[in-house]
């Protein structure tokens, strides 16, 4: 029987078969646009929309997804890294790009050059962003991250307030928001 034949195949055959399997995900960009329209209908036109396109839009193609969402009027895009921000830089058409994964002080000038908002919990990053902003004649925008239980990036609430005050008093830096990632 076919089942018996498969049962008797050597382990190497299974490993070869599994290693050649490449999952594929297809996205219907028209359905994406429709779904965005439904979200906008539910929340109203006064609510801004930030679309997360990190991890190559979760494997669906960040550039194509970003292009379609720009054409639908999405206000901002979220990515995890500056490399991801750079991949969508030419297609985001002036929309805000927020780097949620944090950056190191060494990456600050690049973040400013890419015109990205940065989520941070670091005074050193705020200082480096200020230096990059002043040197380039731009403004760096920061979102202060509060740790609410994920323990990846973020400050205790009192420390976040302190960092927000520091950012507000720093030339070249504009604190945009305080944010968190709620642990479930």
Regions found by a protein language model. Give the residues of each.
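Active-site-proximal beta-alpha core segment in soluble small-molecule metabolic enzymes
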Residues: 19, 23-26, 31, 47-184
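Generic cytosolic/nucleocytoplasmic N-terminal low-complexity/intrinsically disordered segments
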Residues: 6-7, 34, 53
């Amino acid at each position: 029987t076919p089942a018996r034949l498969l049962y008797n195949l050597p382990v190497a055959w299974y490993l070869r078969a599994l290693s050649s399997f490449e999952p594929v995900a297809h996205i219907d960009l028209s359905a994406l646009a429709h779904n965005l329209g439904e979200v906008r209908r539910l929340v109203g036109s006064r609510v801004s929309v930030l679309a997360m396109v990190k991890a190559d839009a979760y494997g669906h193609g960040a550039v194509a997804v970003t292009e379609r969402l720009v054409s639908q009027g999405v206000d901002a895009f979220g990515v995890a890294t500056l490399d991801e921000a750079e991949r969508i830089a030419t297609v985001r058409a002036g929309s805000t790009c927020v780097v949620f994964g944090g950056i190191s002080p060494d990456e600050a000038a690049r973040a400013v050059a890419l015109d990205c908002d940065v989520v941070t919990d670091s005074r050193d990053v705020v200082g480096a962003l200020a230096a990059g902003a002043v040197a380039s004649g731009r403004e760096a925008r920061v979102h202060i991250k509060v740790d609410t239980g994920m323990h990846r990036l973020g400050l205790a609430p009192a420390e976040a307030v302190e960092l927000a005050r520091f950012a507000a008093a720093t030339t070249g830096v504009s604190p945009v928001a305080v944010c968190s990632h709620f642990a479930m």
